[in-house]
From Swiss-Prot:
This is Race-specific elicitor A4. Residues 47-111 form the Chitin-binding type-2 domain. It comes from Passalora fulva (Tomato leaf mold). Residues 19-39, 112-135 are annotated as: Disordered. GO terms for biological process: effector-mediated suppression of host innate immune response. InterPro entries: Chitin-bd_dom, Chitin-bd_dom_sf. GO terms for cellular component: extracellular region. Residues 1-18 form the signal peptide.
Length: 135
């Protein structure tokens, strides 16, 4: 019995020593995934099953010309947010009772005022003078 155990141990150690010792392949590190924006409210999904024409629809904080529709996944309120486009020229209107794509002047999308680009060459587009005019 001892001879068999000794022989088996010797074979296992010998096999382990005979294996090539290649360094493990480097796997690139991936940045952790951030959770995508999900406005789907479990209670609304449970209550409405998102079946009504205005149920489970939300504004998209990233775009005025799209909205988010929640698609139910199960009975406990989990839902998948799906970004849907508005027709060309329309924006999302999230007013109670509406929740549809509407003309921009009727949309509830926050208006983003474009910031003016700074002009090159100093203040107001003119080069700053080096000396004081009285000297």
């Amino acid at each position: 019995m001892h001879y068999t155990t000794l022989l088996l141990s010797t074979l296992l150690v010998g096999t382990a020593l005979a294996q090539p010792t290649n360094p493990p392949a480097k796997t690139p590190k991936k940045a952790p995934k951030t959770q995508p924006y999900n406005p789907c409210k479990p209670q609304e999904v449970i209550d409405t099953k998102c079946m009504g024409p205005k149920d489970c629809l939300y504004p998209n904080p990233d775009s005025c010309t799209t909205y988010i529709q929640c698609v139910p996944l199960d009975e406990v309120g989990n839902a998948k947010p799906v970004v849907k486009p508005c027709p060309k020229g329309l924006q999302w209107n999230d007013n109670v009772g509406k929740k549809w794509c509407d003309y921009p002047n009727l949309s509830t999308c926050p208006v983003k005022t474009p910031q003016p680009k700074p002009k090159k060459g100093g203040v107001g587009g003119k080069k700053a003078s080096v000396g004081h005019p009285g000297y």
